[in-house]
Amino acid sequence: METLQARFDAVQEQLLEIYEQDTSSLDVQITYWTLIRHEQALYYYARRQGILRLGIYQVPPTGVSEKKAKDAIKMTLFLKSLQKSEFAAQPWSLPETSLERFLAAPENTFKKRGQHVTVIYDKDSMNAMEYTLWTEIYAVDDNDQWHKYTSGVDYDGIYFTDAQGNKNYYVSFADDAALYSKLGHWEVQYENQVLSPPVTSSLPPGPNRRRGPQTRGHPRHKSASFRRSASSGSDTRDSRGRSRSPSSSRSRSRSRSRSPSGSHSRPRAPHVPDQETGRPPGGGGRRGSRDQQQGPGGPAPPSPGEVGTRSGPPETKAKGRLAELISAAYDPPVLLLQGCANTLKSFRRRTTQSYPHTFLCMSTSWTWASKTCTVKSGHRMLVAFVNSEQRTLFLATVKIPKGVTCLKGSFDGL
């Protein structure tokens, strides 16, 4: 029993060192999964001997240990194969080589640089889903050769393009529309663009009306003021993508404006482009300036240097989901955990491995060092979040260990 406990403690100590180092070496990731296999083997042996606890850790059933040991062997084999490829010198972190990400769609591939894609069903902002687009995907073929693919998104789903130029969809919006949509309609939002189904016009093209190119993607904040700022000699384009000659519209306007005596009224002065008047497109100077700073969607998001600069609490009267997120970005919320050092370290390891999406960053365990401090002794750990919604998700998803207290707070910056 003592020998088993000593070997188990040695494995745990090596795992904690890897967590503390937070290195991006592929060799360290291979060592990590080798230690996980040793850990599960010790769990399996202890359970077979009737031992239910090893230190502060509860021994899982043999079926669980066997399954996790096989997963560790699988990850070790894939990582050793990746180590022989041209991508071995790239940085590889623990989240990027985790089992959860490796099994996420597309399965059995390593993924980096995930980005959010929002899909709104039936034009209802409350009926929206978020998907992850992996910018970099690393996959191995039947010849044990590794390839790097890039991902893209269109109205049909999220895909990666293989070496032959074929699109391989790993997320299909139509499949989820059968579950979440009643009308079979959805809208894709990605990187300031809205991807919608093409709209065809019922008006036939004429000599003064021609169709504009149809695109599935268009800028999210495209304003009608850009159409009004066209010069007098160019075509104006309506909201459906059709272009219309200004001369024809003016001729119709002049033909309808007659004086009571039957003579034509004098034509109005030609339209002067906004660029020549010095005004911003779309109206007066003050209003146009405000629209350029904030954009049609609401307040402008903070720059990287402004994140965490507010000295007071976030505003609670922000209108709309985007405004709330922008308001909360200035004051990153945190949790202060207090408890035993080993318990906090184990909690950080388990949370980092199983729930990396529920928090922004997590500190090491620490204590107050000043002799004048009257606060009770004990180790502490800080958990930072992107916003209060993520902190709520963390508290609802992650189980706080017994004996660990939790306090809410916020910082001016991280």
UniProtKB/Swiss-Prot annotation:
Residues 1-202 are annotated as: Transactivation domain. Its main location: host cell. Residues 196-317 are annotated as: Disordered. Plays a role in the initiation of viral DNA replication. A dimer of E2 interacts with a dimer of E1 in order to improve specificity of E1 DNA binding activity. Once the complex recognizes and binds DNA at specific sites, the E2 dimer is removed from DNA. E2 also regulates viral transcription through binding to the E2RE response element (5'-ACCNNNNNNGGT-3') present in multiple copies in the regulatory regions of the viral genome. Activates or represses transcription depending on E2RE's position with regards to proximal promoter elements including the TATA-box. GO terms for cellular component: host cell nucleus. Phosphorylated. This is Regulatory protein E2. Binds DNA as homodimer. Interacts with protein E1; this interaction greatly increases E1 DNA-binding activity. Interacts with protein L1; this interaction enhances E2-dependent replication and transcription activation. Interacts with protein L2; this interaction inhibits E2 transcriptional activity but not DNA replication function E2. Interacts with protein E7; this interaction inhibits E7 oncogenic activity. Interacts with host TAF1; this interaction modulates E2-dependent transcriptional regulation. Interacts with host BRD4; this interaction mediates E2 transcriptional activation function. The lineage of its organism: Viruses, Monodnaviria, Shotokuvirae, Cossaviricota, Papovaviricetes. GO terms for molecular function: DNA binding; DNA-binding transcription factor activity; nucleotide binding. It comes from Bovine papillomavirus type 3. It is found in: Host nucleus. InterPro entries: E2/EBNA1_C_sf (IPR035975), Nucleotide-bd_a/b_plait_sf (IPR012677), Papillomavirus_E2_C (IPR000427), PPV_E2_N (IPR001866), Reg_prot_E2 (IPR033668), Regulatory_protein_E2_N (IPR036050), Regulatory_protein_E2_N_1 (IPR042503), Regulatory_protein_E2_N_2 (IPR042504).
